[in-house]
Amino acid sequence: MGYNAIIVPAGGRARGMDWTIQTAAMRLHILKKGDAITMMRISKRCQAVTGSLTLEIDAKAKEMKARGLDVVGFGAGEPDFDTPEHIRNAAKDALDRGMTRYTPASGMLELKKAVCEKLRRDNGLSYQPQQIVVSNGAKHSLFNTFQALLDEGDEVIVPGPYWVSYPELVVMAGGVPVTVQAQEENNFKLSPSQIEAAVTDRTRAIVLNSPNNPNGFVYTRDELKAIGDIAIRHDLIIVSDEIYEYLVYDGAEHVSIASLSPELKERTIVINGMSKAYAMTGWRIGYTASPLHVAKAMTNFQSHSTSNPNSIAQWAALAALSGPDDQLKNMVAEFDRRRRRMVELINGIPGLSCKPPKGAFYVMMNISGLIGKKLDGVPVTGSMSFTELLLESKQVAVVPGIGFGADRYVRLSYATNMENIEKGLARIREFAASLQD
C-alpha cells in the first residue's frame, strides 16, 4: 500500500489518518493515497492580485525554446547585454573580502551615499543618505512606497497604457487604481485636463513613468510642470518611476519632476534602480529617494519583510553608480539602431503601425487594422488572440496590450539582437498577410 506524507498545521483536519506525530507547532499526518484533505483558503487580498502577464509570456517563449522550437521573443523587459565587467569584478571582490553579512535594512551607507551623489550629478536633486531606501529591485521599491502611503480605499491615478504591475501593487496595498487612458495621437501622454478630471476626494497619488514602459514616451519639462501644478493644487503625492532615465533617443531629455521645485520634491517619491541602465535585472537592486519620514516608514516596513537587499549585489551597485559608463553609452546607441529598424519594419506591414518611441526599449504596435480578420477561421478579437495566434503559427512572442490596459496594441521589446528583429518582423509580416476577412 502506498502513502503520501503531508504537513497539516495544528488544528488542521485530514481524513484516513494512520499515524500522527504532534509537536507544539504542527502535526504530521501520513495518509493513504486518494484520501481527501481540506484545501487551504487563499486570502481575498491575494485573490485580487493577478500574475504578471509579461513574465508569463517570457516564460512561455523560453519553455518553447527549451523544447527545440525556433521562437523569436519580443517579450523580454531586460537588456540583452552582460553586466559590465567592472561591476562583476566588484561583486567578486566583495565575496573575496567576506562582505556576506547583514547590512542595515535600508542598505549600506556607502551605496546610499553613491545614490545621493548620482541624484545630485544627474538629476539636480539634493538628498541625505537617510532619505534613501535600497530595496530588492525597483518593483520592491514601488511595493514599499504604496504600502507606506496608502490606506484602504485610497485612489491612485495610473496613466494608461501602464506597466502591468502598477495597478496590482496599488491593490496589494489596499488602494484603488484609477486608470486614465492616454491616446496614441497624443503620443500616449495624459493631458492636464484628463488628470484633473480623474481627481476625487479619495485621490492620494499619481504614478508617473518617464521614459515609459510600455509606450516609450518621454514627458517634457513643461508637461511635467503642468502635472506638478495639479499635484500641488490637489495635495497629491507623485510616485515617479525613473528606471529608464538613461535610455532616451532623438534628443529627448529625461527630467525628474522632483527637480522642478522644492515643493514638488517634498511630495515626490523618486523610484530608480540598477536593472535597465546597467544590465543588472537579476541582481535586484532598486531604491527610493523621499522625504525623511517616508523613508523611515519604508525602512521599518522592509525591516520586517525582506531585511536588507543582497549584500554582494549592493557592492556591485556601488561600482555601477561610481564607475565608468562606456558600456551604457554603447548600449543606448545599439538600442537606438534597433529601435529605428523595428519602427521602420512595423510601419511597412499593412494593417500594423507604431509611433517611434523616444525612450526605454519598447514599441507599442497598433493592431487595429487586423482585428476582425481570421486565421483558419479563428478571428483576431484583440491583443490576446493576436498574441496566441502569432505564437502558435509563427513562433513569435509579443506581449498582449490588454495587460497594459490597451487591447488594440501589443508590445514588442527591441532588447534583442538585430537578427531576431529582422527574422521576427518578417514572420509578423507573413502572419498579417495570412489573415483573411
Regions found by a protein language model. Give the residues of each.
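A glycine-/small-polar-enriched, mobile loop at the entrance of the PLP active site in fold-type I
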Residues: 75-80, 93-112
